[in-house]
């Protein structure tokens, strides 16, 4: 009886471990394949970021603020968590290519300046399931802003580069915005 129980337990453990071993070898071979590409590739991407703070289904929500944030003309200390749509064109109904997921916070007392920590997660096309990571200051009132790309995953592993942001549309009452991003990365 004890021997049968031992064999049963071993079979269950083996069944549970096999998929993990198989998955690990697939991930390893995929990672090696990416590393063997040789020279860096330069990729340029254009997409639109739809930041919606208003309505029944906002994609950006305030998650924290300082004690004096409401008194500040720049909302200094406000922190927002986002899951914003990325589309092919500025039209919100255009093709969804991914999501911008991360956070931004008002980090300047004298100007509208945001510190942004964002992953652009691609859900369609040749870059499906790949991401690029951006972190840096966004001087939101400037017509053109540049922020660094500091990493990536999937097809963009080891990415570095820059993002140029231009506000396409902004509603000062709600804070909703559509921002065009032109991203140049080496990977």
Swiss-Prot record:
It comes from the Eukaryota. Dirigent proteins impart stereoselectivity on the phenoxy radical-coupling reaction, yielding optically active lignans from two molecules of coniferyl alcohol in the biosynthesis of lignans, flavonolignans, and alkaloids and thus plays a central role in plant secondary metabolism. Homodimer. It is found in: Secreted, Extracellular space, Apoplast. Keywords: Apoplast, Glycoprotein, Secreted, Signal. GO terms for biological process: phenylpropanoid biosynthetic process. This is Dirigent protein 23. It comes from Arabidopsis thaliana. Glycans are attached at residue 182. Residues 1-24 form the signal peptide. Belongs to the plant dirigent protein family. Its main location: secreted. GO terms for cellular component: apoplast. Coiled coil: none annotated.
């Amino acid at each position: 009886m004890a021997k049968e129980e031992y064999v049963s337990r071993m079979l269950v453990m083996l069944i549970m471990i096999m998929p993990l071993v198989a998955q690990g070898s697939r991930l390893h071979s995929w990672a090696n394949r990416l590393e063997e590409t040789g020279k860096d590739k330069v990729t340029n991407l254009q997409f639109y970021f739809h930041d919606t703070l208003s309505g029944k289904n906002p994609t950006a929500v305030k998650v924290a603020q300082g004690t004096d944030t409401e008194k500040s003309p720049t909302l200094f200390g406000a922190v927002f968590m986002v899951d914003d749509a990325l589309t092919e064109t500025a039209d919100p109904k255009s093709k969804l290519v991914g999501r911008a997921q991360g956070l931004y916070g008002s980090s300047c007392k004298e100007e509208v300046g945001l510190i942004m920590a964002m992953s652009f997660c691609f859900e369609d096309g040749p870059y499906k399931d790949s991401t690029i990571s951006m972190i840096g200051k966004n001087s939101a009132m400037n017509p053109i802003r540049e922020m660094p790309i500091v990493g990536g995953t999937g097809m963009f592993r080891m990415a570095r580069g820059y993002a140029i942001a231009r506000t396409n549309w902004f509603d000062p009452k709600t804070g909703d915005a559509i921002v065009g991003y032109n991203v140049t990365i080496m990977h």
